[in-house]
Amino acid sequence: MTNQTWSPSKACADFVADLQYADIPAAVIDTMKRDTLDWIGCAVGGAADRSSQPIKAVADVLGGNSQATSIDCARRNVVLAAMSNAYFGHILEMDDVDRDSISHPATPNLAAAFAAAEFAGKQGKDVLLAAVCGFEIMLRIGAAITPAHYKIFHTTATTG
């Protein structure tokens, strides 16, 4: 018999495994759609900025199978597409901010959700569901560990 004690990791995993799109309130979906459009605008601007060149060069050198599309329209393996999109989304420092967690939740969550959804052949509702799950977990963990954590670490990187 296994020990079924509660843990924060198990609670997060259960939340993600159990949440269905139909369970998400309409107001949350509307907010997520708005946040997604905002992030896309930031990422498109970031991809066009000259400071995006290093990540593009790294992604090109690492190569891999063409599995997902980056915001700059390049086809990359799914991990490099997600990494590039996250980088692009944060370049201009105009992405969203959550004050309680001192983080930018859209960048890591939407970058990963879009790349993974394209790779897996999923639809828009799946992207929104994944993003809601990611935001919820990231923001709760971030709020629990800040502000002391933020004195040393960038919360977006450590909780996203």
Summary of predicted features, one role per range:
Residues 2-160:
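N-terminal core-entry segment
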